[in-house]
A protein has these predicted regions:
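Serine-esterase "nucleophile elbow" of acetyl-processing enzymes
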Residues: 2-51, 58-67
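Alpha-helical cap/lid subdomain in secreted, periplasmic
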Residues: 5, 32-38, 56-189
Length: 189
């Protein structure tokens, strides 16, 4: 892989799906991805239980301390699980994108899917938030990284929400080309 000569920093602003929930941090996908992106720095800003509002509150300090070249936004799952308004999610994610871009960082936005028990109208409105924001200038939209994992009980913890340790290498495999794309400063095809 040909990376830019400049080492870059990517901040992952996420929730428990990125925070190694239910396992040691060393076994999580972020840590597994680090050696594959040698010379670059992955900063975990993932906190279990985080909502888009919580991520927005924490973001200025994370941008100041990490000074990232790119921000991977992986928030919304807890907003959906709590039945928060898609309009509120959109407002928070828009501010996260704006703050990240104002700091000079490129933005990679991960789609998030909500459980089907919330009904098709809520799920559609929720998905539309990501589609709309992913179309903004300077934002790369990444498909939901749990697709293919969440339906496999062998890859999920007993709660049916969080990926287990066996899923972490698969998530790292999924993430790697997206991170490379961001590091090469071009949208992924």
């Amino acid at each position: 892989m040909a990376f830019p000569l400049k080492a870059e920093t990517i901040l992952i602003l996420g929730d428990s799906l990125s925070a190694s929930y239910g396992m040691e941090e060393k076994d999580g996908w972020i840590n597994l991805l680090r050696p594959r992106l040698e010379g670059h720095t992955l900063v975990s800003g993932a906190v279990s239980g985080e909502t888009s509002a919580g991520g927005l509150r924490r973001l200025p300090a994370l941008l100041e301390s990490a000074k990232p070249d790119a921000v991977l936004v992986m928030l919304g799952g807890n907003d959906g699980l709590r039945g928060f308004s898609p309009a509120e999610l959109k407002k928070n994610l828009t501010k996260i994108i704006d703050l990240s871009q104002a700091s000079g960082a490129r933005v990679l936005l991960s789609e998030v899917m909500v459980p089907t028990n919330y009904g098709p109208r809520y799920a559609k409105a929720f998905a539309e938030v990501y589609a709309e924001l992913g179309a903004l200038p300077g934002v790369t939209l990444m498909p939901f990284f749990m697709t293919g994992i969440i339906t496999d009980p062998q890859l999920m913890q007993r709660d049916g929400i969080h990926p287990n340790e066996a899923a972490q290498p698969k998530i790292a495999d999924f993430m790697q080309p997206w991170f490379v794309s961001v590091l090469e400063n071009r949208p992924k095809a």
